Curated annotation (Swiss-Prot):
Name this protein carries in UniProt: Insulin receptor substrate 1
Keyword terms of this UniProt record: Differentiation, Growth regulation, Oogenesis, Phosphoprotein, Repeat
Gene Ontology annotations of biological process type: cellular response to starvation; determination of adult lifespan; germ-line stem-cell niche homeostasis; glucose homeostasis; growth of a germarium-derived egg chamber; insulin receptor signaling pathway; insulin-like growth factor receptor signaling pathway; lipid homeostasis
Bias-annotated ranges (Basic and acidic residues): 720-731
Annotated segments matching region Disordered: 247-270, 304-373, 528-559, 703-734, 907-948
Disulfide bridge positions per record: none
Encoding gene (name): chico
Chain positions found as Phosphoserine: S286, S287, S342, S554, S912, S915
Biased composition (Polar residues): 304-329, 529-556
PH domain location: 8-109
Function: Activates phosphatidylinositol 3-kinase when bound to the regulatory p85 subunit. May mediate the control of various cellular processes by insulin-like peptides. When phosphorylated by the insulin receptor binds specifically to various cellular proteins containing SH2 domains. Involved in control of cell proliferation, cell size, and body and organ growth throughout development. Also has a role in a signaling pathway controlling the physiological response required to endure periods of low nutrient conditions.
Originating organism: Drosophila erecta
UniProt cross-references to PROSITE patterns, sorted A to Z: IRS_PTB, PH_DOMAIN
Residue interval(s) of motif YXXM motif 1: 410-413
SUPFAM superfamilies, per database record: PH domain-like
Length: 948
């Protein structure tokens, strides 16, 4: 090997040529005063020593690129690219490669420093032949070219002469930005590689087709260029530097381009990582000052902030350096490419990669994208102004004068009642002056029109803080205020009323019209008139459409519970039946409490009887002609309908009134005609209500029992007995009718009240009789006819009291059915056999006063009284209302004429379940009364009591 000191030889040795893979003796010379730096090779070392001519001399000043090649089968290859073509050498090891490559790059830089020439460090250089296809012939790019790749562009350098054999001009060198390349690909069998250019490229849109040495080179070109296109590019850096007179920044470390949105349409590069590493190695060899690693870019939106450790390899530039741009600089104006003043300290900008995202937001390095320091818009501390500015403005000025200045932004949740209306007006005026500096104009919104007609601070008239409204909500609220009005126009300061739920602001509930919620001192002066649906105060009427207190749309105040009506049902829907004309007659009857009700309402009018008990009554006009009476029932129950069964509800009727009054007259005035017995008073005249005081005299009853004809001769009547005594029935009834006619006018009022009481029911303690009549055979008891004429009294004979166990008793207060009352007058003419019972007729109280007849009968066995039941108690337990569970019997109590002052008899005769064998004929002219206990079926057997 020749000495370096001879002629500037630096390195020498046996190396292989890339094309032929033959060993040659290569000698590298430095630049001297006599010659320039060059690379020579000989066939053998012997020829070199003999000073033979070298096979080829490659001057380093003609090489625009010296780099390592990675796309060949050999691992250690160095390529020297020049306008004459590329020359490649193959080394034995990595150390030999690094030694030769470093020396070549040093010599190249020395030449560049001496001549002032800047060499572009290309990452990859391929020698291709551009075919006459696509736009190549039109633009003059045909023949052999070097395809040189950098991180930002793809450069084609002409090899050979500048003209074609046909005399056409060839482009010596052209640079195409990677951002203007739409796509690239290769055809493996034909060793073809192509690129599709966009309209922003310097050549225009079109395709470039080029042929490589082999298919491996085409594949490597495709993968490498595609990887560079996917990385961050610095395509417009050179143009920016030209405008700003700054040197090229291509020697600075680069950052790979991020993936675009249409990354799925691009072929997958399987050798990206390996090629990137090789590119960095080649770059570091060709440019020793570029040993910094490029920063990779994520493929998705950032999901977290980076740490300081992640940004250790990042390099930031001060104000003296321009930053890269991610847009095409071919036609961009200078104003859009301003310089960035980003800080020099490391900021965490690296983001995590994500495969799911198809869109990548690239960071702009221009000055317009940054402030002096970068702002992390993903920070949780960053304010997002999503709220309406009206809300902030109204909340800022909604403060109370009593609060401190430190609580300006606090909205009080308690009622605020101004003590003076003038003070309130001044307060609103001050707030308007403060709001004058804040004007928010919404030209296309409907709230502008309302500002001319309405007061926007009208919500503060009730002393409340100013409500913060969003855009559009004030319109509906002002209409609602106009509809409701304000009660404070009358000089009052009403409190806030309960809040409406969503959707209920369109109407005013009836319960709110009937319930005026005002200050505790003034609430007693108001009266609600349900029939007119208005609110009255000292004679002044405020109808529904007039001004009343404004409803609040906020939450109700819990502190105003004492001002609200105590009626717990006031918030429910009320059904007012007070205007119904067909219910006026029974309006005074309420919840089956007529005895107590009449005592409280009717004036007390004592009867001229021998008893100390009185009957409370009123005039016939007040009771039956529909005069409205003042009741003492709780006012809360006034507007509700009693939910009783409709079929059993009683309605007063006057159809059967004359006949019933006749019977009352007969009963009341039979005793004065006789001298033997006093007359009882009628305190409570009811079919099922017997005064308990009349049953206390048990000793007197025992004395009457000994003289009763029932104890002497119990008898049984046959059907023929009733028929044979029809003439006696005529005479008896004629006498009784004459007596009743004479006393008609005197007892009209008392009879009406007695009829009214008969239609109503008292307490449960006085409603029931003592026994159930369930015998299987008839027991017929009669009295002698001379006993009836002897005392001149109305005798009663119980033919039968039939109890049908198949019928279930309803509640006792529901037995007065309107249907039965209408038919009761027709049943008075039915025929039946009756027997006298003086002991029972002495003091019984019944619904109808019925006279009986004296019938002839045969005497029966004296052993009959063993079937008689003694009446011991009148207070029976309440019966079940069920129609299925327990069959119950019907009971009857008889109001007998007042022939005696003693208690009623204790013995009644059992009847049979059977119907009477033969009934008396109604054509005899006698008057009969029938008590029918059947409420469900008129055809069923019933208990019948008849008057003879």
């Amino acid at each position: 090997m020749a000495s370096i000191s001879d002629d500037g030889m630096a390195l020498s040795g046996y190396l292989k040529k890339l094309k032929t893979m033959k060993k040659k003796f290569f000698v590298l010379y430095e630049e001297t005063s006599n010659s320039s730096a060059r690379l020579e090779y000989y066939d053998t070392e012997k020829k070199f020593l003999q000073r033979a001519e070298p096979k080829r001399v490659i001057y380093l000043k003609n090489c625009f690129n010296i780099n390592r090649r990675l796309d060949t089968k050999q691992r250690f290859v160095i390529v020297l690219s020049s306008r004459d073509g590329g020359f490649g050498i193959v080394l034995e090891s990595e150390n030999d490669l690094r030694k030769w490559l470093d020396k070549l790059l040093v010599l190249q830089r020395n030449i560049a420093n001496t001549n002032g020439t800047a060499y572009s460090p290309y990452d990859q250089v391929w020698q291709v032949v551009i075919q006459k296809k696509g736009i190549s012939e039109k633009v003059g790019i045909t023949g052999t070219y070097h395809c040189c790749l950098t991180s930002k562009s793809l450069t084609f350098v002409c090899i050979g002469p500048d003209k074609t054999p046909n005399g056409e001009e060839r482009v010596a060198s052209i640079e195409i930005l990677l951002t203007t390349i739409r796509r690239c690909g290769h055809a493996s069998p034909q060793c073809i590689f192509y690129v599709e250019l966009g309209r922003q490229s310097v050549l225009g849109s079109g395709d470039l087709w080029m042929e490589t040495d082999n298919a491996a080179v085409a594949t490597n070109m495709h993968n490498t260029i595609l990887s560079a296109m996917s990385a961050k590019t610095e395509s417009n850096t050179n143009l920016i530097n030209v405008y700003q007179n700054r040197p090229d920044l291509s020697h600075e470390p680069m950052r790979k381009r991020s993936s675009s949105a249409n990354e799925a349409s691009k072929p997958i590069n399987v050798n990206v990582i390996q090629n990137s590493q090789n590119s960095l190695d080649l770059r570091s060899c060709s440019s020793p000052h570029n040993y910094g690693f490029g920063r990779e870019r994520c493929d998705s939106l950032p999901t977290r902030n980076g740490t300081l450790s992640e940004s250790s390899n990042q390099t930031y530039f001060g104000s003296n350096h321009g930053l890269r741009s991610n847009t095409i600089s071919g036609i961009r104006p200078h104003s859009s490419n301003k310089h960035s003043n980003s800080p020099t300290f490391t900021m965490p900008l690296r983001c995590s990669a994500s495969e799911e995202s198809s869109i990548s937001i690239e960071e702009s390095d221009d000055n317009g994208s940054f402030s002096h320091y970068r702002l992390n818009t993903r920070s949780s501390e960053t304010a997002i102004p999503e709220e309406n500015i009206d809300d902030f403005a109204s909340a800022e000025f909604s403060k109370v004068s009593e609060q401190n200045e430190s609580d300006e932004n606090y909205i009080p949740m308690t009622p605020i009642n101004p003590t003076d209306a003038i003070h309130e007006k001044e307060k609103v005026d001050m707030q308007r002056l403060e709001d004058g500096s804040l004007h928010f104009d919404f030209p296309e919104h409907a709230s502008e029109k309302l500002a001319r007609d309405f007061d926007l601070d009208s919500d503060n008239q009730c002393g409340r803080p100013i409500r913060a409204y969003s855009i559009g909500n004030k319109v509906e609220h002002l209409k609602f205020n106009k509809r409701l009005g304000h009660l404070n126009d009358t000089g009052q300061n009403p409190n806030r009323v309960r809040a409406y739920s969503v959707g209920s602001k369109s109407k005013i509930p009836r319960c709110d019209l009937q319930r005026v919620v005002l200050v505790e001192d003034n609430k007693h002066e108001f009266a609600a008139n349900r029939s007119q649906s208005s609110i009255t105060k000292e004679g002044t009427s405020y109808s529904t459409s007039s001004n009343r207190q404004k409803k609040s749309t906020s939450a109700p105040l819990l502190s105003l519970k004492n001002h609200i009506n105590s009626d717990r049902m006031s918030d429910l829907m009320e059904i007012d039946f007070s205007q119904a004309t067909n219910l006026e007659k029974q309006k005074f009857i309420k919840n089956n409490e007529i005895p107590k009700y009449i005592e409280n309402v009717f004036p007390k009018t004592p009867r001229t009887d021998s008893s100390s008990l009185t009957l409370h009554a009123t005039s016939q006009k007040d009771i039956f002609n529909g005069t409205k009476l003042n009741n003492t029932v709780n006012a809360s129950e006034e507007g509700y309908l009693e939910m009783k069964p409709v079929g059993n509800a009683y309605t007063p009727s006057s159809n059967c009134l004359p006949i019933k009054v006749e019977k009352l007259k007969i009963s009341d005035y039979t005793a004065p005609l006789t001298t033997a017995a006093p007359v009882h008073d009628l305190n409570k005249i009811s079919a099922y209500n017997i005064s308990a005081e009349k049953w206390k005299e048990q000793s007197l009853c025992e004395e009457k029992k000994s003289n009763s004809p029932l104890n002497e001769t119990p008898c049984s009547l046959k059907p023929t007995d009733v028929e044979s005594n029809s003439h006696d029935e005529h005479s008896t009834n004629n006498m009784e009718c004459e007596v009743s006619v004479q006393c008609d006018k005197q007892n009209n009022l008392d009879d009406k009240v007695a009829e009214n009481n008969n239609l109503d029911i008292g307490g449960h303690e006085e409603k029931k009789l003592v026994h159930s009549i369930s015998s299987e055979d008839y027991t017929q008891i009669k009295d002698k006819s001379n006993d009836f004429t002897k005392f001149n009294e109305a005798g009663y004979k119980i033919l039968q009291i039939k109890s049908d166990s198949s019928l279930i008793s309803l509640k006792l207060y529901q037995k007065g059915i309107h249907k039965d009352n209408l038919e009761r007058s027709h049943r008075l003419t039915e025929s039946v056999n009756t027997i006298p019972d003086n002991a029972t007729a002495s003091s019984s109280v019944t619904k109808f006063n019925i006279n009986t007849k004296a019938a002839d009968s045969r005497s029966t066995d004296p052993s009959t009284p063993q079937n008689i039941l003694q009446i011991k108690d009148l207070n029976f337990p309440s019966r079940s209302s069920s129609r299925i569970s327990q069959p119950e019997l019907h009971y009857a109590s008889l109001d007998l004429p007042h022939c005696s002052g003693q208690n009623p008899a204790k013995y009644l005769k059992r009847g049979s379940r059977e119907s009477p064998p033969v009934s008396a004929c109604p054509g005899d002219g006698n008057t009969y009364a029938k008590i029918d206990f059947d409420q469900s079926d008129s055809s069923s057997s019933s208990s019948n009591i008849f008057n003879t």
